[in-house]
Amino acid sequence: MMKASRSDTFMLRTWIQLLVLFVIMFIMSAILPIAASVEGLGFPCYFPNLVDYSLLNLTLRNAAKHLTPTLFLEAPELFVYITWSVLVDLASAIYYVVGALAILQARKTHLTSMITLQTWINLVGSHTMLFIGIARMWTLQLFIHVLSYKHVMLAAFIYFLHFCLSYMHTLSLVSRNSPKWSVLLMEQHIPKQSLLSTILDYGKPLCVNMYLSLLALEMLVFSLGFMMAIGNSFYILVSDTVLASINLYFVLTTFWYMMTEMFLQDYLKLQFGFYLGVFSGSLILLLPVLRYEAVFVSANLHKTVAVNIAMIPAMCVIAMMFRLFRYSQQVRKPENSYTPLPKRFKKRRQKQDQQLIMVETSDEEL
């Protein structure tokens, strides 16, 4: 067994320090929504209550003198979203802590090369993934702070940053920021029948699916918040912002379905958390239609909005059935221990071989 180099030891120490910051940031993210809901703790308003949605009028245009009510999450729905976000981050913190313990345990008995430690850290969660996770929790805290002051434009901008960070974080969790053939090579360094192999085989897929479900809800919050900012910035009909937010959510989820089948399914076959999150988001979208049915009926938009919302779960069912079909085909098919190189790598390798043959031929002639 070879001892870890100083660079590997430094890398592990900095990774554990980032993990400590991740846990501290999670604790703050869990405490902040509770503190923001209690009067007298410095928050001017109860952050889920942006406007009085009983004044919602779909036939009016924005007056630009006050906050015009548009479609957004009300207090119960926003509470559910924040609670689920905290629970997912809790599961992630537990996963990282157990992963760190597994790496320390495997380091004592299974370290076989100087690059093995770096490989284990990349498989559990690299420094970049931890940093992005810290940043996304911080932006969510900032989003809650700004909502308590009723600054919709600033809140929409901050949530845009949070959504981008969450998107990159989830994408990195699935793909590990590496090509498939590189991931297969890294997985060969995992000690068999160890805590590290258990946490990577069972803990990480569960954590990834929870983040996928959260990403689906974050797409909804981003769509509603973005169009709420647009609706309060320009002189447009409130009904246009409502339909635009629904259609934006439909486009974002459809894009993720396509990316899953074309790219992400190579890394994780069993990823159904996103579909469950989309179903939950569709139910959340239906609540305002049911709660303010008279408003939508009076504006002759009840059927239009209902049809647009119904397209989201319908597309989700189609995408989920297609994923189930491909998953069943992949389970029946024997899994290869290797992944073919892309064509560009093959062509590069062929050119190198041809150059090598030409050099050997010229040497023989000499």
From Swiss-Prot:
Transmembrane regions: 18-38, 84-104, 114-134, 154-174, 210-230, 236-256, 270-290, 305-325
InterPro entries for the chain: Herpes_glycop_M (IPR000785)
UniProt topological domain (Intravirion) ranges: 1-17, 105-113, 175-209, 257-269, 326-366
Keyword field contains Ribonucleoprotein: no
Protein keywords: Disulfide bond, Glycoprotein, Host endosome, Host Golgi apparatus, Host membrane, Host nucleus, Membrane, Transmembrane, Transmembrane helix, Viral envelope protein, Virion
Superkingdom assignment: Viruses
Subunit structure: Interacts (via N-terminus) with gN (via N-terminus). The gM-gN heterodimer forms the gCII complex.
Family designation: Belongs to the herpesviridae glycoprotein M family.
Role of this protein: Envelope glycoprotein important for virion assembly and egress. Plays a role in the correct incorporation of gH-gL into virion membrane. Directs the glycoprotein N (gN) to the host trans-Golgi network.
Protein name: Envelope glycoprotein M
Species per Swiss-Prot/TrEMBL record: Saimiriine herpesvirus 2 (strain 11)
